Amino acid sequence: MYQLFRHGIFQMDAEKAHDFTIQCLKLAGNPLFQPILKSLIHAPKGFPKTVMGVNFPNPIGLAAGADKNGDAIDGFGALGFGFLEVGTVTPVAQDGNAKPRQFRLIEAEGIINRNGFNNNGIDYLIENVKNARYKGVIGINIGKNKFTPLEQGKDDYIFCLNKAYNYAGYITVNISSPNTPDLRQLQYGDYFDDLLRSIKDRQAILANQYNKYVPIAVKIAPDLTESELVQIADTLVRHKMDGVIATNTTISRDTVMGMKNAEQQGGLSGKPLQHKSTEIIKRLHQELKGQIPIIGSGGIDGLQNAQEKIEAGAELLQVYSGLIYHGPKLVKELVKNIK
């Protein structure tokens, strides 16, 4: 059945297909229709897991970027995910980069996007999170507005942290998208140190205010040198971050040279990212020595490479591009088998 749906949406522009799918899932998440979707999916229960002090119904999650505004939380939830990461969301709404900005690399099962954090703003997303009936864990992925100077970038993250804290199962600090100018600079040196210090200070204040501890993860890029990775791992440990998501999309085109759309600018996700993200997880795991849990993301399209990420050191997994190419059966297979 999904093959028919995929054939139809693949006739459409990639972003229009994405928006259409979100609307379908929003409708399917409606209390009137959700039982129908659940009966079609027959999602298995999966294996509960506690990571970052949070109880996840199963270790398979939806990666950020799929549901930027939290419009289809209940629809995605019906597919069987143990957790959903909504966003990336910024303090105020922004249009993102010029269209077209999403491109399929069908022969490689990859996607290039240069969206640029298009979203309706944090307040809109929080309302959707508050209204969701989904019983799994909801993570909120936060970023900075495009026109906020890098030097003031931490203010945007603190603003979003304040808004999201009471409604999130966990919060992800996204400093690794290649589509916001200079954003990845926040992964390095004094910027990184200063950002994490500010975030941890604010987390302590909010934990006291709301009488609960909400863990904070950092999402990193796959395009890191060995020394950069070591430095990032050291900084994460030093600031006692609660988790790390490895990885975001890649700007490398080594695995897709010569393919249609490979020349498009932006972040490449899907199967071409599979090996690279697993290698980063493996190296990160060696550096972190179990002190900080890793959430693995990047190119998961089946049980074998999902298991490879677990063996490399990931405790939770996230999918997105694989869902586009393989449909809900991918989620079902992973939930049924990954512990």
From Swiss-Prot:
Question: GO molecular function terms here?
Answer: dihydroorotate dehydrogenase (quinone) activity
Q: Which GO terms describe its biological process?
A: 'de novo' pyrimidine nucleobase biosynthetic process; 'de novo' UMP biosynthetic process
Q: Which Pfam families match?
A: DHO_dh
Task: Spell out the GO cellular component terms annotated for this protein, sorted alphabetically and separated by semicolons.
Answer: cytoplasm; plasma membrane
Q: Which CDD domains match?
A: DHOD_2_like
As its record notes, the protein acts as a catalyst of:
(S)-dihydroorotate + a quinone = orotate + a quinol
Q: How does it sit in the membrane?
A: Peripheral membrane protein
User: Cofactor comment in the record?
Assistant: Binds 1 FMN per subunit.
Spell out the InterPro entries in the cross-references: Aldolase_TIM, DHO_dehydrogenase, Dihydroorotate_DH_1_2, Dihydroorotate_DH_2, Dihydroorotate_DH_cat, Dihydroorotate_DH_CS
Tell where it localizes. Answer: Cell membrane
Which cofactors, by name? FMN
Q: What is its pathway?
A: Pyrimidine metabolism; UMP biosynthesis via de novo pathway; orotate from (S)-dihydroorotate (quinone route): step 1/1
Matching SUPFAM superfamilies, A to Z? FMN-linked oxidoreductases (SSF51395)
Q: Which UniProt keywords apply?
A: Cell membrane, Flavoprotein, FMN, Membrane, Oxidoreductase, Pyrimidine biosynthesis
Which top EC class is given? Answer: oxidoreductase
Residues that, per the record, bind substrate: K68, N113, R114, N115, G116, F117, N174, N179, N248, T249
Q: Which residues bind FMN?
A: A64, G65, A66, D67, K68, T88, N141, N174, K219, T247, G270, G299, Y320, S321
> Catalytic positions?
S177 (nucleophile)
Role of this protein: Catalyzes the conversion of dihydroorotate to orotate with quinone as electron acceptor.
Q: What is this protein called?
A: Dihydroorotate dehydrogenase (quinone)
